[in-house]
Curated annotation (Swiss-Prot):
Belongs to the group II decarboxylase family. The lineage of its organism: Eukaryota, Metazoa, Ecdysozoa, Arthropoda, Hexapoda. Pfam families: Pyridoxal_deC. Catalyzes the formation of serotonin more efficiently than dopamine. Displays no activity to tyrosine. Variation in the synthesis of bioamines may be a factor contributing to natural variation in life span. Its EC number is 4.1.1.28. This is Aromatic-L-amino-acid decarboxylase. Substrate binds at T117, H227. Residues 1-29, 358-384 are annotated as: Disordered. Pyridoxal 5'-phosphate binds at A183, S184, H227, D305, N334.
Amino acid sequence: MSHIPISNTIPPKQTDGNGKANISPDKLDPKVSIDMEAPEFKDFAKTMVDFIAEYLENIRDRRVLPEVKPGYLKPLIPDAAPEKPEKWQDVMQDIERVIMPGVTHWHSPKFHAYFPTANSYPAIVADMLSGAIACIGFTWIASPACTELEVVMMDWLGKMLELPAEFLVCSGGKGGGVIQGTASESTLVALLGAKAKKLKEVKELHPEWDEHTILGKLVGYCSDQAHSSVERAGLLGGVKLRSVQSENHRMRGAALEKAIEQDLAEGLIPFYAVVTLGTTNSCAFDYLDECGPVGNKHNLWIHVDAAYAGSAFICPEYRHLMKGIESADSFNFNPHKWMLVNFDCSAMWLKDPSWVVNAFNVDPLYLKHDMQGSAPDYRHWQIPLGRRFRALKLWFVLRLYGVENLQAHIRRHCNFAKQFGDLCVADSRFELAAEINMGLVCFRLKGSNERNEALLKRINGRGHIHLVPAKIKDVYFLRMAICSRFTQSEDMEYSWKEVSAAADEMEQEQ
């Protein structure tokens, strides 16, 4: 075997002409700062705040969809990081030159794709403070305020929605809330908790069965209109998920029960069902008051996914859509979609968090602390270990808007959707593809799917507004979502004119 020679000699220092070590002073002198100093930070931050305010207040004037092609950005910046620090003024100049040409402006009143992602000045300021505190709140002791504010904010939010007391810490029971990153995470966390719960129950009934056998029999359920993240949760959780055929885009209790009984007859073990309140395709609402009791009867974990529509439940007139919530084991919605709280902030409540906590509990010595058990360690409630101080955003928004103004925001968006729907049905060329729910209008040109595909391509190609499509039972349609907090009635008229003009162009070319 060959050996690599090892030298025990210390390489000679580089010296100047006088024999002194030639080392630059800034690498030795602890008094020399390599950081941006506070006065410079203040100037930089003030300039950025001015830029943000100018950007948002005038966002309507920007083309909503960028015209760049993949790879546009690389030629605009150097191939490697700079050796020496640059001036922050140069960075500011590059925002318009490098970044803005490739930004899709989600907060423009002309952006109608997907569902909204929330944005507000109080939330932006809260994120500044969160970034400054820069704690990683995986345990209570890692930053007590981070954990304790989250506990209180989740109770505030739960009370605003009038969730059953069993979900709230203030009830004194087992329940509680946690801020996840996304609804997708919440769905997966609930599935893994349900999986652990059912595994324990079946092992007690059949101690002779091994874990692999039990896991192979587990089956969960969701509507055929459920979000793709539900299917993905099944893949990540290693369990079968069965799609239940919907009726008018909504899952009924009878259909769920039929699917459960079929699987029981085949020797499978039903354990979990997702009930969607506000589907992505058409904002349809599964019958929670039917599906929940069916799940309870068969001892399934019922998870309610209200990612978009859940914000509307702060308005009393929409709470009938969550009828049956008392039958749920977990409930989730995204304040970062429609409640003016910047991404990411996904609110999740569990009636009995212990199933999730025990399923995720890995407790190394370096994460233990003397107060364990006296307050939640949220690392046990989620997939990642680390977590940001997201409760600050909720606290700022709820205090600086108040419930009344948040309700007004929701109602305005719902009214704008009705306005657009009225404009649509007044044109004999168009039809609604689904009932108008919340801030979403599903519409189409009468005729073939191909005509509607061509219409959407033309609308987005014009670049003045941005929409995305959906398809239900082989019917292709366009989705008009009200997304921006800056939206006014005039914006809905403008967006309709864009749709109508695109249809006119198609007719003229025929």
